[in-house]
């Protein structure tokens, strides 16, 4: 008797239940010229009654074997649950004419998505949401608890809302296989349009909600193609607008933060590419912003220096985050008035450059860099003063908001955020000098982080951050331009935000 047989015999004696044994059904399988016998190929057929019976037997055995631990299991569950604040809410985020936020309620399994109308066009101060009290004018956008009724499993797999706040495109998974079924709902009437997009990977609206772009999945769950749908027409008439033939790459689609482009992002572990199409011509052809290069990752977002041109005109910007010239990434800002597509990596003004030291391809940047310690101080004439001499410098993203700019980077293995006013950034950009960032250090990070802070203490720290931004604005000749209006940047996705693929979206 071998060890497995002895263990099974012991379990059968102790529990009175035989350990389920999967039957062997030999099947030859050949790959790359090699043939082997797979005795359990039959288990792949999820619809087979034999498979269902075997899984049920395994479940019965597990339940009986684990029965003595039922009390401990409940104790652990209750302990974990006691550390969770069940009745809670998220920080409101403004999108177009509404503040959106999420509520969770004690005793309910799922969250509820809510919103309230903004008070005015200049309302950038998020409302104070109380856990147990609805706000004036509060609307339920999506109650997952109601939607989940009658399903053994339910997951909300994405939500996009039209610019006028009337239409919602949402996806649900009721099988647990991460293939989502998307529908379009009228938020004013609750009625749903007849078209359905079943078993897909994700979807997005155009700003006017007249078009839907969605991603197809192959048999391996790889998102590989993008389809275009005209709202109000049969799904059978949908058009394929992009297909990724290379199985190493996945595909995503979304809307750019400036809402002027539909973005297709495609990438592998080491290579990415972004394709764009103007929302003014949704039936047009997607074009690569920068053609794909092997082992080069990049992302792009768009912003604008309003009124900063010589004659008071706006300066449209493309903000490119890439590792084509530096293994620890860099950020380039392109003046789109003076550059034309197809763009090239390395065009524009270099705003922040990471350290090549200790990196595999560091020698491409500086001879001998790859053999140097990763913590060697690094300086680059393009970098802001606060980055000069940084140890282990890595650039992680930039966000150009309505009134200020935030730079995210890593030094000495720790994350950092630096800020400056947008007006000062425009001056530095046009003058061709390093940008004058100042590091932003919240009070909670200066000493011990108290996780039991009261709401008043948190508000005090928040006010302190605004004060630092005010001081920064004053130092850069902007008076108090940041105070009161820059708060939007902490709660919404205006302008360019942290870089991520595939295809950044505003939702």
Residues of each region from the PLM?
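Beta-propeller folds
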Residues: 1-507
């Amino acid at each position: 008797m071998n060890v497995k047989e002895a263990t099974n015999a012991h379990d059968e004696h102790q529990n009175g239940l035989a350990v389920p044994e999967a039957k062997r059904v030999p099947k030859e399988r050949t790959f790359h010229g090699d043939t082997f016998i797979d005795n359990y190929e039959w288990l792949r057929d999820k619809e087979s009654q034999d498979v269902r019976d075997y899984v049920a037997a395994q479940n019965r055995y597990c339940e009986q074997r684990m029965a003595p631990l039922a009390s401990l299991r409940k104790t652990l569950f209750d302990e974990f649950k006691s550390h969770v604040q069940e009745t809670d809410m998220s920080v409101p985020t403004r999108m177009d004419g509404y503040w959106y936020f999420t509520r969770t309620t004690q005793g309910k399994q799922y969250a509820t998505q809510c919103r309230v109308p903004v008070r005015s066009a200049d309302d950038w101060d998020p409302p104070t949401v109380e856990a147990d009290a609805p706000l004036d004018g509060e609307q339920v956008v999506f109650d997952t608890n109601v939607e989940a009724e009658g399903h053994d499993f339910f997951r909300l797999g994405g939500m996009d809302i039209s610019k006028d706040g009337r239409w919602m495109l949402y996806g649900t998974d009721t099988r647990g296989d991460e293939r989502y079924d998307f529908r379009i709902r009228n938020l004013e009437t609750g009625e749903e349009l007849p078209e359905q997009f079943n078993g897909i990977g994700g979807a997005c609206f155009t700003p006017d909600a007249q078009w839907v772009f969605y991603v197809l999945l192959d048999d391996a769950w790889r998102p590989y193609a993008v389809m275009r749908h005209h709202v109000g027409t049969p799904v059978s008439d949908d058009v394929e607008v992009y297909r990724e033939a290379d199985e190493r790459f996945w595909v995503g689609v979304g809307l750019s933060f400036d809402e002027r482009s539909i973005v297709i992002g495609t990438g592998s572990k080491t290579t990415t590419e972004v394709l764009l199409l103007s929302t003014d011509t949704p039936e047009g052809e997607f074009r690569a912003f920068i053609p794909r290069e092997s082992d080069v990752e990049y992302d792009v977002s768009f912003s604008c220096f309003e009124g900063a041109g010589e004659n008071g005109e706006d300066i449209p910007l493309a903000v490119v985050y890439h590792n084509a010239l530096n293994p620890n990434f860099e950020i380039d800002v392109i003046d789109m008035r003076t550059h034309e597509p197809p763009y090239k990596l390395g065009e524009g003004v270099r705003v922040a450059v990471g350290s090549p030291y200790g990196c595999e391809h560091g020698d491409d940047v500086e001879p001998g860099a790859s053999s140097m310690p990763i913590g060697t101080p690094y300086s680059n004439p393009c970098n802001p003063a606060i980055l000069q001499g940084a140890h282990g410098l890595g650039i992680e993203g930039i966000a150009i908001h309505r009134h200020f700019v935030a730079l995210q980077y890593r030094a000495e293995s720790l994350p950092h955020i630096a800020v400056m006013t947008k007006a000062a950034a425009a001056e530095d950009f046009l003058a061709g000098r390093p940008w004058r960032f100042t590091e932003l250090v919240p009070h909670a990070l200066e000493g011990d982080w108290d996780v039991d802070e009261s709401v008043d203490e948190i508000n005090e720290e928040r006010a302190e951050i605004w004060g630092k931004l005010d001081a920064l604005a004053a130092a850069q000749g902007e008076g108090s331009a940041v105070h009161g209006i820059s708060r939007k940047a902490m709660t919404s996705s205006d302008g360019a935000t942290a870089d991520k693929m595939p295809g950044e979206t505003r939702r």
